[in-house]
Regions:
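Acidic, histidine-bearing metal-coordination/catalytic regions of metal-dependent phosphoesterases
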Residues: 1-23
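Core catalytic region of metal-dependent phosphoesterases/phosphodiesterases
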Residues: 2, 24, 28, 33-103
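Beta-strand-turn-beta hairpins that frame and shape the catalytic cleft
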Residues: 19-26, 137-145, 204
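Active-site neighborhood of phospho(di)ester-bond hydrolases with catalytic His/Asp-centered motifs
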Residues: 28-29, 54-58, 81-85, 146-147, ...
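Active-site environment of divalent metal-dependent phosphoester hydrolases
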Residues: 32-36, 62-65, 87-92, 152-154, ...
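Active-site neighborhood of divalent metal-dependent phosphoester bond hydrolases
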Residues: 67-137, 141-143, 160, 165-178
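Short loop/helix-cap segments at secondary-structure boundaries that form the rim of catalytic
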Residues: 73-74, 200-206
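Binuclear metal-dependent phosphoesterase catalytic core
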Residues: 208-232
Length: 232
């Protein structure tokens, strides 16, 4: 991994969450700073933040100029956010003064930060550091892995000790999709990821890849019960 992990070192690698069966649970792919697209997707399913839960698979920052507003909105609706490689770039750029990270960040949609105050950016970074690199969700009898991406032969029950390897595997890896091998997401019934841009969601083994915002023109919002219904 060419980008340092000084800032992201302290972030939790995995968070376990249980949600009652009667609750509606949604998962959304990369948002790329597009607040109107998020609101439109949620309105289409009559999302109620008092009753429903939203999981974001990372890369909610960058590209769109509404990144800061999008982040505060996600907080307001109590969305469960997972970090992606763009959040990693932001944290290392602003907190670690990592020049390689900053150059890559600003070349790939990070320039929105120039119009946001340093105070707001500082608060945002502090909040991002409280978000995990992955979530293992128990819902309706299924164990579901959620992360920005994942590596071949990833074992959700046994993470490596090397934090840089975890970051590389869960935030940056593209080998599973590039090679299109039937790989298994070990230790979970299935897993859901963003990161790998596609026009339509697709399965590789028991992993589901839903980053449609870049090529498909809008983010994919899944209702988890509907995904589970196709597996039962």
């Amino acid at each position: 991994l060419d980008i340092g992990i000084n800032a992201i070192q302290a972030v939790s690698s995995k968070q376990a969450i249980f949600i009652n069966d009667e609750c509606r649970v949604f998962v959304i792919g990369d948002l790329d700073g597009d607040l109107p697209a998020l609101k439109n997707a949620l309105n289409n399913v009559n999302f109620d933040p008092e009753r429903d839960t939203l999981f974001c698979l990372g890369d909610f920052v960058d590209r769109g100029d509404k990144t800061y507003d999008l982040f505060t909105y996600l907080q307001a609706i109590r969305a469960c956010m997972i970090l992606g490689n763009h959040e990693h770039l932001m944290l290392e750029s602003l907190l670690s003064n990592d020049k390689a990270a900053f150059n890559l960040w600003t070349d790939n949609g990070g320039n929105w930060h120039k119009s946001v105050s340093s105070e707001k950016l500082s608060v945002m970074c502090d909040e991002l550091l409280t978000k995990p690199l992955s979530i293992v969700l128990e819902y309706r009898g299924y164990i579901i892995g959620l992360s920005h991406t994942f590596a071949q032969s990833w074992d959700w029950e046994n993470y490596p000790d090397d934090k840089s390897l975890i970051v590389q595997s869960l935030l940056w890896d593209r080998e599973v999709v590039k090679q299109n091998k039937v790989v298994k997401s070990h230790g979970v019934d299935f897993s859901i990821h963003g990161h790998n841009s596609t026009k339509a969601p697709f399965w590789v083994g028991n992993s589901y890849h839903i980053d449609t915002n870049y090529y498909g023109g809008k983010p994919t919002l899944l209702e988890l019960s509907e995904v589970i219904a196709t597996l039962d």
